[in-house]
Structure formats: structure tokens, C-alpha cells
Amino acid sequence: MSNGSVPVSGIGGRGDGEGSSQVHMESTGGMDRAKVFAVYGKGGIGKSTTSSNLAVAFSQLGKRVLQIGCDPKHDSTFTLTKRLVPTVIDSLEEVDFHMEELRPEDYVYEGYNGVLCVEAGGPPAGTGCGGYVVGQTVKLLKQHHLLEETDVVIFDVLGDVVCGGFAAPLQHADQALIVTANDFDSIFAMNRIAGAIQAKAKNYKVRLGGVIANRSERTDQIDRINERIGLRTLAHVPNYDVVRRSRLHKSTLFELEEQSEELERVRDEYLSLAAALWNGVDPLSPSPLKDREVFDLLGFD
């Protein structure tokens, strides 16, 4: 099937792992088969672009991949599916929020190269709690064993919010990845995200995997903060125009028909990143700085 909802085997109702602060789940068992990554970063930094291209890179390596968009804008997976797919909240509304009536094919869609796509969605702007929807989505995915029946799960998480339901992916992830650019605002957010992830790591298995430098020709400021707090850059995607064009084509970089040195380089970067993450990168335990320390550290002499 292409770009449509897909049936997934193994529907069942079993205990859940702990989700958001609003959702009680009982067990995190049964997810050992999949490598689970949570992607965070400053709003607008390119997390969805990064997540979708990384998902395809994993699929190019022969892995079964599930990408979960955790933003009310529900635009994480459109380059994979070529459309804004119905969200989990849309599907729940159709069954009057009786979660037990949903089937995987009601909210799971197949995208490019077989990547499975889910969009959590959220309430209308200014109402409700988007984080709660993320927590409920995690619960639903576990009930239907979707976090077990894949090789790789990628959570693409809203902005730099690491609280409540938006922290639910961290409670199920093996590693968190932070997308940043070589600028003050992105790095400032990165430092705060690293602190939040470290706090979660005290009670959950999640560890920081590293940093993905995005939309940046240079990485000197990223390198400076990495050295200071104990992070590392796993991949570097320069600010190539081919990335912008791929979004306008509603396409991942791997589907573009054009040929260019820039395109080949960025494809290779994602494939190398996927291979490194699959083979395993050493977990990090950074020591984030206080906000004023970041302010004093960054910039030019």
C-alpha cells in the first residue's frame, strides 16, 4: 500500500509503560526489539526534516521504521506521505474518544519506502493540552504493540518543550537527539533541553546520544558548548538550498530526482548517521550550564 492507512498485526490490550504526567501506564516491557529515538530542538530548527530523512535513511538500511509526530501542527510526516494525514486526535473524535475502538489502520499511514507514520495532533490553538494528546498517543501505540513490531521508532517532538506529555517520548526512548544550529538561540535551547533530558535519565533508561548540527555552514559555537558540557556532534547538515527545495516538493531528500554534489553529501550524512545510531553510539551524561553561563560562553571575543 502506498501513502494509505495500513493494517498492523498483533492488536491487543496489554499493560502500558508510564506515560505523561496525565496518563498512567504500568509497564515499559516489550519494547526491547526496537531502537527508540526522541528528537528535540528549538522550534523551527528542522526537527521534522531531520526526523523524516533519518527515518528514510534507516529504511534504506533495511530497517522497519515508525515515525511519530508529536506536534499539534501534525506536519512531521508530510514529506513521507505527501499529505497531512489524519491525526490520532482526529481518529479519537470519530469514535467519541473510546480508545478501545481504534485499530492501527485508523491512524497509521505508510509513507515513502515503507516508513510507517503517525501524527498525534492536538486540540485547537488556545484550548486543551497538546502534551496530553502525546501521552495518549504513546499509550495507544503500546496497546497495539506498534513500539514492538518495528526496528526503529523516531519521536519528532514539539519545539523545546520537555514537560508533561511532551516528555512522554523520553520515558520510552533509548536515546534523545538534539537538533541545533550554530546560533545563540538554538544552542541556548539545546543546553536547556540537555538539562531536562538529564533529569529524566535519573528515572528512565533514556540517555543523550548527541547533537545534529543543522542549517549551519560552521559549527564553532556548537563545538564550544559541546566541549564545555560534554556533548558531541553526530552529524552536520549545512544550510543547503536542496533541503529547502525538498520541503517544497513535499519530499524527503532521498526522493529528489535531481543530481548534485550537495544532495549526495547530505544523503550520505543521513545514511552515516543512521548506521552509527543503529550500531550504537556511547550514551552521554552532559553537565548543562546555567543560562547566564551559556550567555557568557557563546559569541566572539
Curated annotation (Swiss-Prot):
ATP binds at residues 44-49, 73, 214-215. Keywords: 4Fe-4S, ATP-binding, Bacteriochlorophyll biosynthesis, Chlorophyll biosynthesis, Iron, Iron-sulfur, Magnesium, Metal-binding, Nucleotide-binding, Oxidoreductase, Photosynthesis. The keyword Hydrolase does not apply. It is an enzyme of class 1 (oxidoreductase). It catalyses: chlorophyllide a + oxidized 2[4Fe-4S]-[ferredoxin] + 2 ADP + 2 phosphate = protochlorophyllide a + reduced 2[4Fe-4S]-[ferredoxin] + 2 ATP + 2 H2O. Mg(2+) binds at residue 48. Its EC number is 1.3.7.7. One of its GO terms (molecular function) is oxidoreductase activity, acting on iron-sulfur proteins as donors. GO terms for biological process: light-independent bacteriochlorophyll biosynthetic process; photosynthesis, dark reaction. Residues 1-26 are annotated as: Disordered. Binds 1 [4Fe-4S] cluster per dimer. SUPFAM superfamilies: P-loop containing nucleoside triphosphate hydrolases. CDD domains: Bchl-like (cd02032). InterPro entries: NifH/chlL_CS, NifH/frxC, P-loop_NTPase, Protochlorophyllide_ATP-bd. The keyword ATP-binding applies. Pfam families: Fer4_NifH. It comes from the Bacteria. [4Fe-4S] cluster binds at residues 129, 163. Its cofactor is [4Fe-4S] cluster. Pathway: Porphyrin-containing compound metabolism; bacteriochlorophyll biosynthesis (light-independent). PANTHER family: LIGHT-INDEPENDENT PROTOCHLOROPHYLLIDE REDUCTASE IRON-SULFUR ATP-BINDING PROTEIN. Belongs to the NifH/BchL/ChlL family. NCBIfam families: DPOR_bchL. Component of the dark-operative protochlorophyllide reductase (DPOR) that uses Mg-ATP and reduced ferredoxin to reduce ring D of protochlorophyllide (Pchlide) to form chlorophyllide a (Chlide). This reaction is light-independent. The L component serves as a unique electron donor to the NB-component of the complex, and binds Mg-ATP. Homodimer. Protochlorophyllide reductase is composed of three subunits; BchL, BchN and BchB. This is Light-independent protochlorophyllide reductase iron-sulfur ATP-binding protein. It comes from Halorhodospira halophila (strain DSM 244 / SL1) (Ectothiorhodospira halophila (strain DSM 244 / SL1)).
